[in-house]
């Protein structure tokens, strides 16, 4: 499967520029910083870390010339596209998908209360993915990589 195969099925073509990717990195950084604040509830910290994860997945799609539509399932699609958009292996994507499922259970069913360990695991996974995105941009799309110091 390629990203082109998903055109019309949740993805559409959309060019990105360096400023847009810089904004993604700024948002990701803020959400990660907030997710580490011990004064915030665990479920809010989990949500913030998940939002950072989603921003990375969306930024990776944008760097490849795509974006999700607003159709149902767009968050899942963005995460499941990570092997093609960022070169992630299937095992890491499955782990990220588990975080998405937990967040959905909490958001839509009030059936998930994250532990401190689960929040920390998600934050670590997102920090790693943020580094992966930066390295991918530097190697594959230096024209979109945020300038040093940003």
Region roles according to the model:
Residues 1-150:
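Terminal alpha-helical segments
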């Amino acid at each position: 499967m390629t990203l082109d195969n998903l055109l019309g099925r949740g993805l559409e073509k959309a060019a990105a520029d360096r400023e847009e990717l810089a904004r993604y990195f700024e948002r990701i950084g803020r959400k990660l910083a907030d997710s580490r604040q011990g004064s915030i509830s665990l479920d809010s910290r989990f949500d913030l870390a998940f939002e950072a994860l989603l921003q990375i997945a969306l930024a990776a799609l944008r760097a490849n010339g795509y974006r999700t539509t607003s159709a149902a399932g767009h968050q899942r699609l963005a995460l499941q596209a990570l092997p093609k958009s960022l070169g992630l292996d299937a095992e890491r994507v499955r782990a990220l998908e588990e975080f998405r499922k937990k967040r959905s259970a909490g958001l839509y069913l009030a059936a998930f209360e994250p532990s401190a360990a689960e929040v920390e695991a998600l934050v670590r996974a997102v920090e790693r993915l943020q580094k992966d995105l930066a390295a991918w941009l530097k190697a594959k799309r230096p024209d979109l990589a945020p300038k040093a110091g940003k």
